Amino acid sequence: KMRELIPYATILTPNLTELYALLDIDYPSEIPSYDELEKMCKCLVDKGAKMIVVTGINVKNKLINFVYEEGKKYRIVEVEKIGDERSGTGDVISGVIAGKYLLEQDFYKSVEAAANFASKCIKYSQELGVDNHLGLCFEPFLKEL
């Protein structure tokens, strides 16, 4: 059903698993190259999406966010990987991207702001000792957005 909504989407924010599901492709044993990611994003653009960020690609203690906009060269937003995965991180990232974009911020800058915001919240959550399944503590930092 999600695939049917692609033509109506301006922004898509899939992680790798979701990207492969949207394209109905089997999940690979290796992380795709940037060229492969670009081809997959172009397929989503061909289906109607305008902007895509493939979030949270784990590469050597870094998290890569692959940013693709229709008609432009892809760009990368990279942040340090902090701890293990936390529930809700993708939701926070998607929310910040949407909010910043609606405030007429450039898409790439929106992704950059979202990645940095999530990193700050994850670090704070770890300092507080919050269990990963409880997500990230973002409320103290909302005013910074």
Annotate each language-model stretch with its function.
Residues K1-Y74:
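Conserved phosphate/ATP/ADP-binding segment of small-molecule kinases
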Residues M2, I93-S94, A118:
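Alpha-helical structural signal
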Residues E18, G56-K60, E80-G83, A115-S119:
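Glycine-rich beta-alpha junction loops
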Residues A21, D84-F107:
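Short, small-residue alpha-helix embedded
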Residues K73-R75, K100-A114:
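Phosphate-handling active-site elements
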Residues Y74-G88:
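Short pre-catalytic strand/loop immediately N-terminal to key active-site residues, enriched for Gly-Thr
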Residues Y108-L145:
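Charged C-terminal helix
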